[in-house]
Design a protein with these regions (language model features):
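DNA major-groove recognition helix of helix-turn-helix/homeodomain DNA-binding modules
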Residues: 70-85
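Short amphipathic recognition helices of helix-turn-helix/homeodomain-type DNA-binding modules
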Residues: 86-96
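N-terminal flexible/basic segments that precede or flank functional cores
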Residues: 1-29, 94-131
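Recognition helix of helix-turn-helix/homeodomain-like DNA-binding domains
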Residues: 50-66
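Short basic helix-loop element that most often maps to the first helix and adjoining turn
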Residues: 29-46
Length: 131
């Protein structure tokens, strides 16, 4: 994979997808914890935001969700939360932002990105949430 990361198009696609998956997982997991903490079922949450219960079940499933920002904002609001953006820490900016903007990384950085990606993917699988 480190060799593939030398290709600017692959690098941008890989980093973009990695950040997308990690961010969605983080947001969805936080919303699911808030839902559980509030004692809400998925069906009750769906009623609160006037959507089909399948929308909420899909959001909290272990499959690779791709929710809209609107859905995430509505779910967050129903749980007394809001979505916010925060700057990346310096080490993540170096590993993600700079390569995205430049379209290139050094061989050492490519190896490190590949190593971190493998480690994150092993540990970031969301467990299926009971219905």
């Amino acid at each position: 994979m480190a060799e593939d990361l030398k290709d600017p198009a692959f690098l941008r696609e890989f980093l973009g997808e990695s950040v997308r998956v990690a961010t969605i997982d983080m947001v969805v997991n936080a919303l699911d914890q808030a839902r559980k903490g509030a004692g809400l079922t998925k069906a009750a949450l769906a009623r609160a935001i006037s959507v089909n219960p399948a929308v909420v079940r899909r959001l909290f499933s272990s499959e690779r969700p791709n929710p809209t920002l609107g859905t995430l904002a509505e779910v967050a609001a129903a749980l007394g939360m809001r979505l916010t953006l925060e700057p990346l820490p310096a080490d993540e900016r170096k590993a993600v932002t700079e390569p995205l903007l430049q379209g290139a990384v050094s061989a050492d950085t490519a190896k490190e990105i590949a190593k971190q990606a493998v480690e994150k993917r092993k540990g970031s699988r969301r467990a299926p949430a009971p219905v």
